[in-house]
Amino acid sequence: MTSEVLQGSGLSSSAFEVMIGAVLSGLYNDMTVSPVLIAQIGQYTENIYFGKPCGLMDQCASSVGALIHIDFKDNDHPVVEKVDVDFSSFHHSLCIVDVHASHADLTDDYAAIPTEMKEVAHFFGKEFLREVSEEEFKAHIPELREKMSDRCVIRALHFFKEDARVEKAVSALKNNDFDTFKSVIKSSGDSSYKYLQNIYSNHDETNQAVSIALGLSEDILGDKGVCRVHGGGFAGTIQAFVEDDYVETYKTEIEKYFGKGSCHILKVRKYGGKKVEL
């Protein structure tokens, strides 16, 4: 097996897991195992055998392919919708920048996010925050702050706003409104930095490669694009949506800081794992 997925980027393990699932489905099941089930098997493997408390989003992205919109209300049967979009039709490209800081030792930081959000949900007698209304949450913030850390509260605030942003972003793409989509990406990234706080580890605040990449990217891009942290955060990569006529400039400038080959200009593949008959 060969791979061009960046090691420690936050997607490498998911890509590996679903590739193995696709291979086994092809060898023994005539490719009949659904992409979502392969993603769920990959998540189980990562949770149980590798001790990484990941969700299902990365595995679904790798297994289903295309840009996808996922509703996790029923964890056993998530609703996955492909969003048909070609960034080139909007004269933009997706750039992924490797900041050369690995996710490998950040399991505790990543795990704290769902743990703290669930702590807020448990205050209301629920398992997940989606079962709590934003209005009810805001009405009890003083009591929440007495019972738990402020970070739990601020991360919960991000959750409610982020869910709304997802719907707005999907709607914008379906309506060919790329300016609104970029605006949502920008506000989502800002919220990740300020409220979700997944840009650098509180256990190692002297190393802030993602922060540097975002700051430099905003300076380089100006009004030519938007950027945000990519994946689970804390390290790994950032993403930037850049106007096509400015992509090479952005790539040249950002690679001055992170090295030649650190900026990858990508296209979103429309398919997940496939068997190719030779």
Regions found by a protein language model. Name each.
Residues 2-5, 100-101, 233:
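Short, histidine-centered active-site or binding-site loop motifs used for metal coordination
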Residues 1-89, 221, 247-251, 270:
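Gly/Ser-rich oxyanion-binding loop with an adjacent helix/lid
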Residues 13-14, 42, 58, 97, ...:
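Buried hydrophobic positions in well-ordered alpha/beta secondary-structure cores of metabolic enzymes
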Residues 22, 236-237:
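Catalytic DNA-binding helix-loop module of base-excision-repair DNA glycosylases/AP lyases
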Residues 230-236:
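Short Gly/Ser/Thr- and Asp/Glu-enriched loop/turn motifs at secondary-structure junctions
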Residues 69-228, 240-278:
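C-terminal nucleotide
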Residues 15, 237-241:
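FabD-like malonyl-/acyl-CoA
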